[in-house]
């Protein structure tokens, strides 16, 4: 469980607990093809982590009232490229995935 008081009121977040070493690709397979292509050659556990975290990001964007249908691609250093008016952060580790987003006018950066 994540403590909502850790985030500003304007932030929306999504968390997911999964089985350790999960290779469930359900959410990965739901991603935009351009997102799936970012890790197309990775092992299944990496695809599952990536897919779950990106899926959480899309859920959080929708909760924020933003278009969640566009792919969240990567910048040159691997960071997520959020929509222009949004700041956010992704995380994934064994058994846990999460994303948090907020309007950039109110929250300049997160991480």
Feature-to-residue mapping (PLM):
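Core catalytic alpha/beta fold that binds nucleotide/phospho-ligands
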Residues: 1-110
